[in-house]
A protein has these predicted regions:
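Short acidic, low-complexity intrinsically disordered linear motifs used
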Residues: 1-10
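ATP-binding glycine-rich phosphate-binding loop
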Residues: 11-56
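ATP-binding glycine-rich loop module of kinase domains
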Residues: 39, 43-89
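Active-site beta-strand termini and strand-to-loop segments that position acidic
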Residues: 51-55, 111, 205
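Protein kinase-like catalytic core scaffold
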Residues: 59, 90, 107, 192, ...
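Conserved structural core of kinase catalytic domains
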Residues: 88-175
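Catalytic activation segment of kinase domains across protein kinase-like and atypical kinase folds
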Residues: 192-228
Length: 228
């Protein structure tokens, strides 16, 4: 069962002061307040992830560190809080998010184990992440000029064979299953597919690969210097 199916409102830890995280505070002060009370998990140029306990288990809290982080929170919540998309097994479940402010300062999700590229490719049953995203584009009917068609892609899939990669028909089936899940997500959201070639945007939750960062969308591209 996905967390958002039965959680309507989950507060921050009871000893936290919501006023310290509102938009009247500076980004620096909000972040300092949170990090003084939670263990840092990681972060990037726009948000910092930390862990807070909920019902006896660790969960992930993402706090915006600038305007780009607020935009990423908005984009991520748009997907995670959607009645259909939020229940797709390919994404990390949402627990709660900031409803007190006009723009969400924070959001809370289940916590996933970080993984590196070799582990991610093994879990997705793919010899490369570029081949995986190629398959997703094929499913969506959005092939790029130099993409392989389905016949070529399958030939390439089984062509690669070494001590670390010996694909079977079962692998091919799982590869297609995950590609279809991602295609379903991307085709019904503004998520940028190419961003999913970055292993840092993935994790492991309940023994399966999940997308943990959904903040890079067609709406947030402007914050990354993309034109057009």
């Amino acid at each position: 069962m996905r967390a958002k199916e039965f959680i309507n409102e989950v507060p921050l830890p009871p000893d936290w002061d919501p006023e310290k995280l509102n938009l009247r505070q500076t980004f620096k002060d909000r972040l300092k307040y949170a990090l003084d009370r939670a263990k840092r998990l990681g972060g990037g140029s726009s948000r910092v992830a930390m862990t807070i306990d909920y019902e006896g288990r660790p969960t992930a809290l993402k706090v915006a560190k600038n305007a780009k982080g607020l935009a990423q929170n908005e984009a991520e919540i748009e997907i995670l809080d959607d009645g259909y998309l939020g229940n797709l097994p390919i994404i990390i479940p949402l627990i709660d998010y900031d409803k007190a402010n006009k723009r969400p300062v924070w959001l809370q999700t289940e916590i996933a184990k970080k993984i590196q590229a070799p582990t991610l490719m093994k879990l997705l049953h793919t010899p490369s992440l570029s081949l995986f995203t190629n398959k997703v584009r094929n499913i969506m009917g959005q092939q790029k000029r130099f993409d392989a068609n389905d016949e070529q892609l399958k030939a390439e899939y089984f062509k690669t064979s070494n001590d670390r990669w010996k694909p079977t028909e079962q692998d091919w089936g799982m590869f297609n299953e995950y590609a279809n899940e991602v295609a379903d997500l991307v085709s019904q959201s503004k998520l940028e597919l190419d961003d999913l070639r970055n292993p840092a945007n993935w994790g492991v939750y309940n023994n399966r690969p999940v997308i943990i960062d959904l903040g890079f969308t067609s709406d947030t591209k402007q914050y990354y210097g993309y034109m057009g």
